[in-house]
Amino acid sequence: MKELDVVDGIQSAGGWIVRNQDLLLGYAVNLVAAVVILIIGSLIARGISTTLIRLLKARGLDVTVVHFLAAMVRYAILAFTIIAALGRLGVQTTSVIAVLGAAGLAVGLALQGSLSNFAAGVLLVLFRPFRAGEVVDLGGVTGTVREVQIFSTTLATADNKVIVVPNGKIIAGNIINFSREPKRRIDIIVGVAYDADIDVVKRVLGDVVAADTRILHDDGVTIRLNEMAASSLNFVVRVWGNNADYWAIYFDLMENFKRALDANNIGIPFPQMDVHLYQAVKARAE
């Protein structure tokens, strides 16, 4: 009895297949086509991702940023590939895209700040206002760029503090790059007493500048009276030097200016206050 039931089931299934062979053949063709689309799409996504990584590394971009951008491109291609495969199987892709769009909008509103940092990170990668190893001022935060990531940038300060700055804040503010140009101007203000001779002061300061071989004299040297302040004559000294020598030149000039002014008996004023005491005498009436 059981054997007859099995035979009847097989015959019934065979009959159904014969009656619906055209429909099944169409589904089989669509299924094979969808699989082929997925395979080809995956190969294309992998090839483009690999090529993009090679090109971005050749431009010297940060490895983390390179792999992140390559992954984003790969996933975007895979998403379009999956939608195309579903469309081949007869799925209404319009509704799928609508659902994904609504979900993307909801996620975008929830992660508005993070997406802003992401967009800013992409702009920093594309326009390269600074690179790893350069000294920059990012909205009042000064340090050496350690790493440029897709959501934030890491700086190391001179006293070895690590500061993480959101990329959105960087794009919204001013970016000052101290390392991009090979040369940099050093500005120093020197205050002397009012009784000092202007020409003598300029000569003394000029001799100190001329003795420093690190200064790029061909780029120009400026030594002028800049301000007649409340208690001093302020001279401005402007010289040019290589970027790597900036602070060494600055500190050495400051020390040598003090020695030279002392050697020539030129006073350096400092803030002072005169206090006058008056003794009140109370008159006595006789």
Curated annotation (Swiss-Prot):
The residues on the Periplasmic side of the membrane are 1-30, 89-90
Any one cellular-component term (Gene Ontology): plasma membrane
* Main localization, broad class: membrane
Protein name, UniProt field:
Small-conductance mechanosensitive channel
Annotated family: Belongs to the MscS (TC 1.A.23) family.
What keywords are assigned to this protein?
Cell inner membrane, Cell membrane, Ion channel, Ion transport, Membrane, Transmembrane, Transmembrane helix, Transport
Per the UniProt record, the source organism is Edwardsiella ictaluri (strain 93-146)
Enumerate the Cytoplasmic topological stretches: 53-67, 112-286
Subunit and interaction comment: Homoheptamer.
Q: Which InterPro entries has this protein been placed in?
A: LSM_dom_sf, MS_channel_1st, MS_channel_C, MSC_TM_helix, MscS_archaea/bacteria_type, MscS_beta-dom_sf, MscS_channel_2nd, MscS_channel_C_sf
Q: How does it sit in the membrane?
A: Multi-pass membrane protein
Which Pfam families is this protein grouped with? MS_channel_1st, MS_channel_1st_1, MS_channel_2nd, MS_channel_3rd
Q: Which GO molecular function entries does the Swiss-Prot or TrEMBL record give?
A: mechanosensitive monoatomic ion channel activity
